[in-house]
Amino acid sequence: MQRIFVTGATGFVGHAVVRALVAHGFLVRCLVRPGSEAALKGFESIDRVPGDVLEPDKLAASVEGCGAVVNLVGIIREHRARGISFDRLHTQATANMLAVAHEAGVKRYIQMSAVGTRRGATSRYHQTKWQAEEIVRASALDWTII
């Protein structure tokens, strides 16, 4: 049975993706920021790994043995005073997860983007989503952007 590593699992889309993966028989390992564990209540069969996409040096061991990484991390608004920005959580997090996946020998990488993302987008949200897509496209992994 293939193990899938999921980031952003505690979010709205992430919750649905985890549910679908479990229903289809995948072994699921979720990266969970400390304090957000309750969002995955009811998923008894998943592995929960405490961590942060902005601290990739602590994630390598967690991704080992996984056949795929599904990166669903994203924010709708920034909270710069708390270090939460589009650049960090869309662009840097994607680069981090790709590097960790590559280092761990993961073959498949799935990246969630957003409708309206394109070159020359006017909103910073879409600009950083586009930058993340470009980072994925440049990677050596077998990738899909949704």
Model-derived segments and spans:
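N-terminal Rossmann NAD(P)H-binding glycine-rich loop of SDR-like oxidoreductase domains
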Residues: 2-26, 30
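Structural motif
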Residues: 3, 67-68, 108
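SDR active-site strand-loop-helix element
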Residues: 7, 31, 72-73, 109-115, ...
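Rossmann-fold NAD(P)-dependent oxidoreductase module
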Residues: 16-20, 100, 135
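NAD(P)H-binding glycine-rich loop region in Rossmannoid oxidoreductase-like domains
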Residues: 36-104, 115-121
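Short alpha-helix in the Rossmann-fold core of NAD(P)-dependent oxidoreductases
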Residues: 87-91, 110, 129
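Conserved beta-loop-beta element that borders a ligand/cofactor-binding pocket
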Residues: 107, 113, 134-146
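Catalytic tyrosine of NAD(P)H-dependent dehydrogenase/reductases that use a Tyr as the general acid/base
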Residues: 125-126
